[in-house]
């Protein structure tokens, strides 16, 4: 039916919703293409719902669930993740299906009580526990800190589906199709990197542990809580999460700068031109006062080279630069090649603070930082051209 599409034409239904209203995810990250909150229903001898949706969409969601159940009751709700964009409708669901058993781990249940006051009708699972629903056998694997402590993933042994919570998720609504084979997925890949860098970025090690755990499973379909159901591109989604969580940047440079009156920006332009002259094609520039930090983080996770420029502002870094750097620092981004530059009018502080940032991140610093006093002089312009010859392995060395 139009209300709920059967993911497999065999008992697994998509009952998620699109959010085309919200401007900022987590009230921070822009959503130009919206976002989906995905929920899945297994209609077997027993009925199992996996995760719910944001409470704002509970009416649409509950109708989809009721339509797919077609008069049957709901036996189990599996809670892979307690974040309110997925757990927000649990209380209303329980009101509608008072006998539903809520499946989770002990960390889930602490949050369930805290957010929803629910303490009854709980079905606790531990690592490797199973739930048989008739044709389907579900196995539960803990995935702590991907990206909350209670997170677990549910593997359907029968259909080889992993219900992966936020892992392998992406921004972007589902515009018609639900499965990747029914749509053009091109625009989701950049959005997946942006989603990863914004939401999951800090938790590279836990993601690696979760990937290790899942590597022994035959995964043919990934049902994440955000974005398309991955079937044709399941291995590509896993590969992106693998590369991101190892902080493995691709060839390229992101130049991040702040500039009040354009002097630091001129330095950034000169450095970019020099990089291009030296054969670097992937160069992205971000004016911190204009680019949302969401997109800056995406490029920092994507590319191996990071160059930061800042004017001095009251003996500190330019505040907007400082704000972006604190978000990068929070995510503990590793393995970057770092260059920096700055400007000042009477007392320079930006360059030494950028140097300290590079050290704190344990990044490899290259080149000679240029510090410009007042307007960009011819000498300093030449220094900008020479300062950051980002050394990529040339074909003959490779």
Name each model feature, range by range.
Residues 1, 71, 297-301:
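A short, aliphatic-rich alpha-helical micro-motif
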Residues 3-11, 390-395:
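Conserved small/polar residues in nucleotide/adenosyl-binding loops
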Residues 9-10, 103-151, 206-209:
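Metallo-beta-lactamase
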Residues 10-65, 153-156, 160-164, 264:
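Conserved beta-strand hairpin/beta-sheet module of binuclear metal-dependent hydrolase folds
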Residues 45, 56-103:
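Active-site metal-binding motif and surrounding structural segment of the metallo-beta-lactamase
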Residues 50-52, 75-82, 103-105, 162-165, ...:
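Active-site neighborhood of phospho(di)ester-bond hydrolases with catalytic His/Asp-centered motifs
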Residues 147, 151, 167-201, 244-249:
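Active-site-proximal loop/helix segment associated with metal-binding centers of metalloenzymes
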Residues 174, 184-222, 226-229, 270-286, ...:
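FMN-binding flavodoxin-like domain, especially the glycine-rich phosphate-binding loop
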């Amino acid at each position: 039916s139009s209300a709920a599409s059967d993911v497999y034409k065999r008992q697994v239904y998509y009952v998620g919703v699109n959010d085309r209203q919200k401007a900022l995810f987590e009230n921070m990250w822009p959503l130009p293409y919206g976002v989906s909150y995905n929920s899945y229903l297994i209609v077997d001898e027993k009925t199992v719902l996996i995760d719910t949706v944001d409470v704002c969409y509970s009416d649409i969601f509950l109708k989809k669930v009721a339509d797919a159940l077609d008069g049957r009751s709901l036996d189990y709700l599996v809670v892979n993740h307690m974040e309110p964009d997925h757990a927000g409708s649990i209380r209303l669901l329980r009101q509608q299906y008072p006998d539903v058993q809520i499946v989770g781990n002990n960390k889930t249940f602490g949050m369930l009580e805290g957010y929803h006051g629910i303490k009854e009708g709980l079905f606790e699972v531990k690592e490797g526990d199973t739930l048989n629903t008739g044709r389907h056998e579900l196995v539960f694997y803990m995935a702590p800190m991907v990206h909350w402590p209670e997170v677990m993933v549910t593997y359907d042994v029968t259909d080889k589906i992993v219900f992966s919570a936020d892992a392998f998720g992406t921004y972007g609504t589902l515009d018609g199709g639900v499965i990747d084979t029914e749509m053009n997925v091109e625009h989701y890949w950049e959005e997946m990197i942006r989603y990863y860098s914004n939401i999951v970025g800090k938790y590279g090690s836990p993601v690696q542990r979760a990937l290790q755990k899942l590597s022994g499973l035959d995964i043919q379909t990934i049902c994440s809580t955000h974005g398309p159901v991955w079937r044709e591109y399941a291995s590509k989604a896993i590969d992106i999460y693998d590369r991101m969580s190892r902080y493995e940047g691709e060839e390229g440079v992101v130049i991040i700068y702040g500039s009040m009156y354009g002097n630091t920006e001129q330095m950034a332009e000169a450095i970019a031109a020099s990089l291009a002259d030296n054969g670097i094609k992937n160069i992205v520039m971000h004016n911190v006062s204009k680019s949302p930090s969401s997109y800056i983080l995406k490029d920092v996770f994507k590319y191996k080279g990071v160059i930061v420029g800042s004017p001095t502002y009251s003996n500190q870094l330019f505040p907007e630069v400082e704000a972006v750097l604190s978000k990068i620092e929070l995510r503990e981004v590793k393995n970057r090649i770092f260059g920096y530059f700055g400007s000042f009018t009477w007392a320079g502080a930006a360059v030494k603070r950028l140097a300290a940032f590079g050290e704190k991140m344990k990044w490899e610093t290259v080149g000679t930082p240029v510090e410009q006093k007042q307007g960009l002089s011819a000498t300093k312009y030449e220094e900008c051209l020479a300062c950051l010859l980002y050394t990529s392995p040339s074909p003959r060395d490779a």
